[in-house]
Amino acid sequence: MSFTSRLKKELFIKAQNLVPQHQLSRVVGKVAASENPILKAAVIHAFKTKYGIDLSIAEQGNALKYKSFNDFFTRALKDGVRLVDENPDSIVSPADGAISQIGKITAGKVFQAKGQSFSVEKLIGDPQLAQPFQEGEFATVYLSPRDYHRVHMPFSGILTETLYVPGELFSVNQVTAENVPGLFARNERMVCLFDTELGRMAVVLVGAMIVAGIETVATGKVKPSGRIELQHHELKLEKGAELGRFYLGSTAIILFEKDKIEWEKRFKAESVVVMGERMGHTL
């Protein structure tokens, strides 16, 4: 890596430490939620042009019909665009995106990037709730700005707890993952925990810089409180059902217990996945 490239990365990381992350995200959130026709049309057009958004696969193909940028960003897809693998033993991708990392949880640590990892206990935010996932399996899926931003169930289960964990709002791209220790266990997140026929399963929705919010079907849109909030539920969700959505991009991490599943060998870091695609299978 050249000196210039290293310097750019260092400045990018330092800038994130200096920027008032939550205040910036709140400002962006207000713009994203605005229903002012001129403002929302301008923002949607700029975003659509920059990221090459394909609205032909969206349920609503007319960008002017969305009531706000948030409405556009969390757009639904047409029926049949994403097919959920129906094999009973399939573990499917919870989202459209790219795999950041995938594999085993070793010594209670989840691999983040070269030279970086974090504890599953810190990720979950509660030692007792994290215990079943020690030495288990994980997959981290990064949703880029151009992706479909709803998160779905990787396997059928009963939602038993949601745990809001306050935190920072670093960017979650590859540069940050390689340079910010414990990134996903430091950022604000919503932990969703399930009982399944395989035992415990977790889906963690991780926030990021300028992410205007996280929403789940059980809690609605999360209102940051600055403190850990545990809620109990008993909500059955089938594989492929919508679990939540991001208002601007971020990351979903799925966790399973030890010796319950195996990932398909073709998947590795940077592999592209789509929601409903088979990523693994039960043992």
UniProtKB/Swiss-Prot annotation:
Superkingdom, according to UniProt? Bacteria
Q: What is its main location?
A: membrane
Q: Name one GO molecular function term.
A: phosphatidylserine decarboxylase activity
| Membrane topology recorded in Swiss-Prot or TrEMBL | Peripheral membrane protein
Identify the pathway: Phospholipid metabolism; phosphatidylethanolamine biosynthesis; phosphatidylethanolamine from CDP-diacylglycerol: step 2/2
- Per the record, residues carrying Pyruvic acid (Ser) are 250
**EC code(s) of this entry:** 4.1.1.65
Q: Where is this site: Cleavage (non-hydrolytic)?
A: 249-250
Which positions form S-S bridges?
none
Q: What is its subcellular localisation?
A: Cell membrane
Q: How is it modified after translation?
A: Is synthesized initially as an inactive proenzyme. Formation of the active enzyme involves a self-maturation process in which the active site pyruvoyl group is generated from an internal serine residue via an autocatalytic post-translational modification. Two non-identical subunits are generated from the proenzyme in this reaction, and the pyruvate is formed at the N-terminus of the alpha chain, which is derived from the carboxyl end of the proenzyme.
The active site of this protein is located at 96 (charge relay system), 152 (charge relay system), 250 (charge relay system), 250 (schiff-base intermediate with substrate)
Q: Does the keyword Nucleus apply?
A: no
Pfam hit, one: PS_Dcarbxylase
List UniProt keywords, sorted A-Z.
Answer: Cell membrane, Decarboxylase, Lipid biosynthesis, Lipid metabolism, Lyase, Membrane, Phospholipid biosynthesis, Phospholipid metabolism, Pyruvate, Zymogen
Cofactor(s) listed in the protein's UniProt record: pyruvate
For this chain's record, the cofactor binding note is: Binds 1 pyruvoyl group covalently per subunit.
Q: Which reaction does it catalyse?
A: a 1,2-diacyl-sn-glycero-3-phospho-L-serine + H(+) = a 1,2-diacyl-sn-glycero-3-phosphoethanolamine + CO2
Q: Name one GO cellular component term.
A: plasma membrane
Which protein family is it in? Belongs to the phosphatidylserine decarboxylase family. PSD-B subfamily. Prokaryotic type I sub-subfamily.
Identify the NCBIfam families for this entry: PS_decarb
Known function:
Catalyzes the formation of phosphatidylethanolamine (PtdEtn) from phosphatidylserine (PtdSer).
Q: What is this protein called?
A: Phosphatidylserine decarboxylase proenzyme
Q: Which organism is it from?
A: Acinetobacter baumannii (strain SDF)
Encoding gene (name): psd
